């Protein structure tokens, strides 16, 4: 019986991997901490996977220079050990070129609007794990892009983490827990 279940599970993983390869993010908006009016909060009361990209501001000639400057800002001592995700060196190594948009963070949520709100507005002192972008004075002038994949699913807790991992391995966001 266990072997039969294991074989079915292996087949499902294969099908989910193939499904994840077909998924495309829908761009929702660009925003900055100085202008959050572009975020359509009411349209984000959905479940699925979200991606936050950061815009390359054109001041750097290559990715290593850009990431070194970004790392200095992100890892500033005032923001360390504050329940925020870290820069992932193994994912940075997957980026060779400086693109217009750099994948910053990838996550999943049963209510994307609430989770994005936390990533932006959660205070640095709070223990909720989030980007806490608004609290970071040294990156307030950056431009971000929010994209989503809406996935309504009664088996969310089983399926979405697997799909999220596949997308994370494909996109390699530079910040995260994994």
Label every PLM stretch briefly.
Residues 1-111, 149-163:
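GIY-YIG nuclease catalytic motif and its immediate N-terminal context
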Residues 19, 115, 119, 123-124, ...:
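Surface-exposed loop/turn and secondary-structure junction residues enriched for glycine/proline
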Residues 69, 100-135:
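GIY-YIG-like beta-to-alpha core
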Residues 126-178:
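C-terminal or late-domain output modules
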Residues 19-22, 26, 122, 136-139:
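Surface-exposed polar/charged interaction patches
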């Amino acid at each position: 019986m266990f072997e039969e279940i294991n074989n079915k599970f292996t087949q499902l993983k294969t099908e989910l991997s193939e499904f994840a390869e077909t998924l495309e993010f829908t761009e929702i908006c660009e925003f900055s901490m100085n202008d959050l009016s572009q975020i359509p909060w009411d349209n984000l009361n959905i479940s699925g996977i979200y991606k936050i990209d950061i815009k390359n501001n054109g001041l750097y000639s290559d990715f290593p220079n850009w990431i070194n400057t970004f790392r200095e800002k992100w890892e500033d001592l005032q923001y360390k050990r504050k329940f925020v995700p870290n820069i992932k060196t193994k994912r940075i190594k997957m980026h060779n070129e400086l693109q217009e948009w750099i994948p910053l963070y990838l996550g999943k949520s049963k209510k994307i609007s609430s989770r994005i709100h936390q990533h932006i507005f959660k205070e640095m002192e709070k223990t909720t794990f989030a980007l806490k972008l608004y609290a970071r004075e040294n990156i307030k002038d950056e431009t971000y892009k929010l994209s989503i994949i809406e996935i309504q699913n009664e088996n969310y807790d089983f399926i979405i983490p697997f799909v999220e991992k596949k997308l994370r391995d494909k996109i390699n966001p530079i910040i995260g827990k994994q």
